[in-house]
Amino acid sequence: MGKTLVYNTGNAKPPTDEIHLEIGVFFDGTLNNLKNSELRMKYRDGKNKIESTDSRDDILKKEKAIEKTREQQEKEYKKLDNKDITDNDSEYDRYLKSSHRGWLDKQGVDNSFSNDYTNVARMYKCCEQYNYGVYVEGIGTLNNSRDVDDGFQYGSGITGVRGKVRKGCEMTADRIGALKKQQRGKKVLTRITIDTFGFSRGAAAARNFAYEINGIKRNQDVEIKKSRKIVGYTQFNSPEGPVMVPEYGDIWIDKDDTEVDPKYIKNGKLPKFGFLGYYLLSKKIVSEQELENIELDVRFIGVYDTVSSYEEFGDMGALRRVGWEGMKHSVLGPKHNFGDDVEQLQLKNPGSYFRAVHFTAANEHRENFSLTRFPGSIEKEFPGVHCDIGGAYENGMETVDEIETSNHKPLWFLNKRRQQLIDEHWYYKEQIEINNKFLNAISFGNVYRKITGIRFLRKEYSYIPLHFMEELGVNLYDHQIITKTEATYSIDHDQYLPHTKDLLHNYVFTGGEKWNFQSDEEFEKEKKERARERAENPEPIWEKPSDETVDKDGNIIKTQTLQEVVVTAYHPQKLLRIMRHEYLHWSANRDWMGMDPNNDYQRRIYGE
């Protein structure tokens, strides 16, 4: 039977001879990295950094200036004698090398330096960081280094999902060690309370982290097996000349082929709390007996749009990644590698927790972005795509070069698809076009055609899920928030977003209906039905009250006319159309590897 966690509204102090710690572990998303975003803002954006309060005209001017800076930095990169990253590089030279995009990079998504903060990074920036917050950079990224394709494409290797979970365990152990040293006297560490947050693959990492330190383990996830590796070389002389012969030594590895020190393994298995326990022991932070006496509670799990897309290949390198494994993935489809993630990562087995929250994207439908549901959590679906919910977009022009192409669909379908996106209020007709239409027709479909959409969008809609995540942590972790997210990432200046937030707040907190899109035909039909009901049931005619009235005791009371208050409200369907036109992005794109839509434009969902 699982343990029951009970929290009150106060922050109870531990006994004087005990240490109780609270730590929040933040796992950022794929190609999301707080440090790399800061470096781009420092070196590329500079005085042209785009602010949430900037007007459209201001943003467009800044975009042009930023692009000029980017072009200048490309010239500076080309002048560097050594393009490889070294320990002797200045921060700026390392930034130039790390943020540079080669030809192959440009066939995929932009890199982690070009993304804005996610909601994971935003909340981390708002929380107490010295004692509480532990930030783990996103899957496929390293601080001020080039992004790693093994992590980005497969969630694999040192920057993959499990690699980041192990890093989260090590960083948490380091934080525990630092806090433990601060305590004077003979105090004993007896309790650790963990909150964990994540977005995208970082959400999968946060859920797997909870399993790692708190879940009911499968044997295969804790068993350590013996293996061998090359530990050196011996030279032998042969008739053909000297020959280097490898020498092998015994090592111990976990299921991901991560080498561990057998001194801290118990009965052939990882210790209590998995890799967190292993690092606490191997770093001499606690003794075996102390570890056994520690209680660990997972208090809050807050995740945005869990996308695992995981297969552990280790650190493959380019040849294997684009070779056999890449061909298999391309031919067999994402389900071949990613269809078993729920079981592999034990995403439905985080162990006991007090509260879990999962915010998901209603309009995401890329083939590599299948959703993994979170049974037992407060799970709410919001309009928008992946990063509309978790963050990472910047304000500015969005160009989707290949929404759909004639390589995948016939011309008649492209026309139909374009009109569908107009009818569903993603684009105005002047924002979306089909290129090479005439040449395609006279060449009997042989000339390549594509649907391209270009529009200006704002990012601040993504602040709303962030605000809700903090609100759902009230009386749990909110005392660790130093600057409120509502203030730091405000939407008060916006004309529409406060109304949007009110509508979604009703859905999240008071059981209101999910905000679904209605077609224009459905909307007009509903309006006519409401008009008919009003005609059949007219409201009573308002009569101005007299200047005075009499109470029950016969006393005359003068009436006072109050100042009229005008409340501006938007019909939910009109507001949703504004959101789609001005705030919600379009993520699927056949122009970039790994960003293709599912053929039916519907999202695949696991873990239901």
Give short role names for the model-derived ranges:
Residues M1-E608:
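Active-site- or binding-pocket-proximal scaffold segments within functional domains
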